């Protein structure tokens, strides 16, 4: 398994945290230098996600976060990797993480590496809908299908076809269709055309900040994006954004499809309820 950790080259404390965390589990990893607002960011946006530059509801830091993931996917495709595990540099790893991340036999035994899929390793401790699937458990963790929104991109495995799917569609999306990268990956706002997202349960990793909040403790690392993400969450809750979203969906003839998806999600919630994905 190739494990890539997105991190600013200057983030010495966070890189030390990652080195200690992964070494503790004997998990090999590589740092991927995160992008920041710069001419380089503008260049890769123009190349890979041109609509992102015109999306004014996202801050420049959020755009840099989005593009850090996109550029890493492009690199993985260029290298011919069948899948890659992606982490952010405030991640905590759970028990027996090495059995998932230092080897990949378990993955190839359970998933078709030539298909489009995401295995979400992270929990944000929000109540989500998951639906049981036929994928066999591994090391006391299950792989239900994620059927609701679940924010965060601190830890996931993404297949080659899923990376290709996102990059091909991101290249042609207009600005109003682009949201934060976790919105695009882990909500029904963006139509993934049936691509499955499997939620590891209990989760294999979590962000240090959110784990500290869950335990009502102070964060040791904080979050470089938290203020930007909180601002975006306020945008998400605003009536104006909801109006703009509906207008955009209608423009593209997808309002009916989105209503059907919301209805389907309501039925799934009635059948399976919502639960907090634990971390251990």
Question: What would you call each of these model-derived segments?
Answer:
Residues 1-87, 91-280:
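An acidic/histidine-cluster motif and surrounding catalytic segment
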């Amino acid at each position: 398994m190739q494990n890539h950790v997105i991190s600013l080259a200057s983030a010495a404390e966070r890189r030390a945290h990652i080195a200690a965390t992964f070494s503790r589990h004997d998990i090999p990893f590589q740092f991927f230098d995160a992008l920041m607002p710069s001419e380089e960011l503008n260049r890769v946006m123009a190349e890979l996600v041109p609509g992102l530059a015109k999306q004014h509801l996202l801050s420049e830091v959020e755009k840099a976060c989005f593009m850090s993931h996109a550029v890493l996917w492009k690199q993985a495709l260029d290298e011919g990797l069948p899948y890659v595990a992606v982490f952010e540099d405030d991640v905590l790893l759970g028990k027996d993480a090495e059995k998932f991340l230092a080897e990949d036999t378990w993955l190839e035994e359970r998933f078709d590496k030539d298909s489009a899929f995401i295995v979400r390793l992270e929990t944000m401790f929000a109540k989500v809908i998951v639906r049981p699937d036929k994928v066999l458990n591994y090391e006391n963790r299950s792989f239900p299908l994620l059927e609701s929104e679940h924010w965060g991109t601190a830890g996931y495995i993404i297949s080659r076809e899923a990376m290709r799917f996102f990059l091909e569609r991101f290249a042609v999306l207009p600005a109003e269709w682009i949201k934060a990268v976790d919105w695009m990956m882990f909500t029904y706002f963006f139509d993934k055309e049936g691509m499955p997202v499997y939620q590891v349960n209990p989760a294999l990793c979590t962000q240090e900040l959110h784990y500290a909040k869950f335990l009502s403790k102070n964060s040791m690392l904080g979050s470089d994006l938290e203020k930007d993400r909180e601002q975006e969450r306020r945008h998400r809750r605003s009536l104006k954004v909801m109006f703009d979203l509906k207008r955009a969906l209608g423009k593209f003839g997808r309002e009916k499809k989105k209503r059907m998806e919301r209805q389907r999600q309501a039925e799934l919630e009635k059948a399976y309820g919502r639960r907090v994905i634990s971390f251990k």
